[in-house]
UniProtKB/Swiss-Prot annotation:
Keyword terms of this UniProt record: Amidation, Amphibian defense peptide, Antibiotic, Antimicrobial, Fungicide, Secreted
Primary location group: secreted
Family as reported in the entry's similarity comment: Belongs to the frog skin active peptide (FSAP) family. Temporin subfamily.
Any one cellular-component term (Gene Ontology): extracellular region
Compartments where found: Secreted
Known role: Antibacterial activity against Gram-positive bacterium S.aureus. Weak activity against Gram-negative bacterium E.coli and C.albicans.
Methionine amide PTM sites in chain numbering: M14
Biological-process GO terms, alphabetical: defense response to bacterium; defense response to fungus; killing of cells of another organism
Domain of life: Eukaryota
Tissue specificity as recorded in UniProt: Expressed by the skin glands.
Record's protein name: Temporin-1Lb
Signal peptide annotation: none
Length: 14
């Protein structure tokens, strides 16, 4: 879902 994508993107940035 959209929220999961945002979290995944944040994890990649960190």
């Amino acid at each position: 879902n959209f929220l999961g994508t945002l979290i995944n993107l944040a994890k990649k940035i960190m």
